[in-house]
A protein has these predicted regions:
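Flexible mid-to-C-terminal extensions adjoining Fe-S/redox cofactors in radical SAM and related proteins
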Residues: 1-24, 44, 287-294, 299, ...
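Short cysteine/histidine-rich metal-coordination sites, predominantly Zn2+-binding motifs
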Residues: 53-62, 355-360
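Radical SAM/AdoMet-radical enzyme domain recognition
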Residues: 59-80, 88-181, 187-189
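Radical SAM enzyme [4Fe-4S]-AdoMet core and its adjacent flexible, acidic
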Residues: 129, 133-298, 304
Length: 361
């Protein structure tokens, strides 16, 4: 891959046409409650008992965000994740309210695809992008049902895309499903799973009498940051021990076959290359420690307890909480993280030095 010195996003026409997109991308981890229990998913980010976010508090934050955007002359793109967002009893009401705000440029939600087709179809009245993470540990019957729903939803005029999770031991299903998606013209990415590094025994995903959470947000943030600072060698070792040799070779053989590109790599001569962020992860060129990064300016991340950070990486101090005062940053920051592994953080504007900021400003 040709050396690059800056990055900008292609996640919307505004991002593609303007160096400063004037859009705040909001990643909102709206709740831990989930109806799946994937082996590779941290107990901190999913369980079957956490309370749903209070509807009134959710509406209050949406109003505050819309007001901030008006004051800044910006719009917002908001992405809801979990847990499983659709298990919230008022999720459709929340989606409708978000879409009604004047500054809402895009509304994205990620789901495991397990809810009824009718619910997803109704959500498309307000959602501009529906992302389905297809997990393969739920059995063939569930997988086939979810694939059928995905293909049906893909007939809508909304942007539907799939994260086809490359689960160890299920690569025959991965390949078969990929062919089905190719035949149905479904946009998808075969997503390499990041091996878990924390001790799952420290927390539990199932409700027990008298149970209290072992970890709080701050403790989990430390673990998350430590994981991002793994060296190339450490990360490579994790992956090659998580997957079998054949599975690993298959993942390494995949080319950048996505049907859309979501980021622009800028080179020293001001030329650029458009690729998908997964290609950076595949080639392990997603380390930006020491770069100037615009998380907090172009993006914010909200954790399950309402704590707000600049990005999903949790770099820097918290900006506040959606239930209290929230101070938006005015300047980009120097990246302190070893590896940028979340798509939403990877596509945020960044430059290797101050010299190359002009490419993205």
């Amino acid at each position: 891959m040709k050396e690059f010195v800056a990055i900008s996003s292609l996640e919307s026409p505004e991002h593609a046409m303007r160096k400063d997109p004037r859009i705040i991308s909001v990643q909102w981890f709206i709740g831990k409650r989930c109806n799946y229990d994937c082996s590779y998913c941290s107990p901190f980010i999913h369980d079957n008992y956490s309370s749903h976010i209070d509807y009134k508090k959710a509406i209050q934050f949406i109003d505050n965000l819309d007001r901030h955007c008006t004051n800044q002359g910006k719009q917002f793109k908001i992405s809801l994740t979990g847990g499983e967002p659709f298990v919230h009893p008022r999720m459709l009401d929340i989606l409708e309210y978000i879409s009604s705000k004047p500054n809402c440029r895009a509304l994205v939600i990620t789901t495991n695809g397990s809810l009824p087709l009718e619910m997803y179809t109704k959500s498309l009245k307000w959602v501009t992008n529906l992302t389905v993470s297809l997990h393969l540990e739920e059995g063939d019957k569930t997988t086939k049902s979810t694939v059928t729903k995905i293909i049906e939803l893909n007939k809508s005029n909304r942007f539907i895309n799939v994260n086809l999770m490359a689960c160890p031991g299920h690569f025959d299903t991965v390949k078969q499903t990929a062919k089905q998606f190719d035949d149905a013209d479904v946009k998808y990415v075969i997503r390499k799973i990041e091996p878990p590094t924390e001790d799952f025994a420290l927390n539990t995903k199932t409700k027990k009498e008298g149970q209290t959470a072992v970890k709080n947000t701050q403790e989990h943030a430390k673990e998350k940051k430590a994981h991002r600072n793994y060296t190339n060698t450490q990360f490579q070792k994790l992956l090659t021990t998580y997957y079998s040799e054949d599975e690993w070779n298959y993942l390494q053989s995949l080319e950048n076959s996505e049907k859309w590109q979501n980021m622009r790599l800028w080179h020293k001569d001001s030329s650029f290359t458009e690729i998908h962020s997964d290609e950076l992860k595949r080639t392990m060129t997603n380390s930006f420690k020491g770069w100037v990064c615009y998380i907090g300016i172009d993006s914010i991340n909200i954790e399950a307890d309402g704590t707000v950070y600049r990005g999903v990486c949790l770099a820097g101090d918290p900006l506040g909480n959606i239930n209290n005062d929230l101070v938006f940053p005015e300047e980009p920051m120097i990246c302190p993280i070893g590896w940028c592994t979340c798509l939403s953080d990877m596509v945020v504007r960044k430059s290797s030095t101050e010299e190359y900021r002009e490419l993205i400003e």
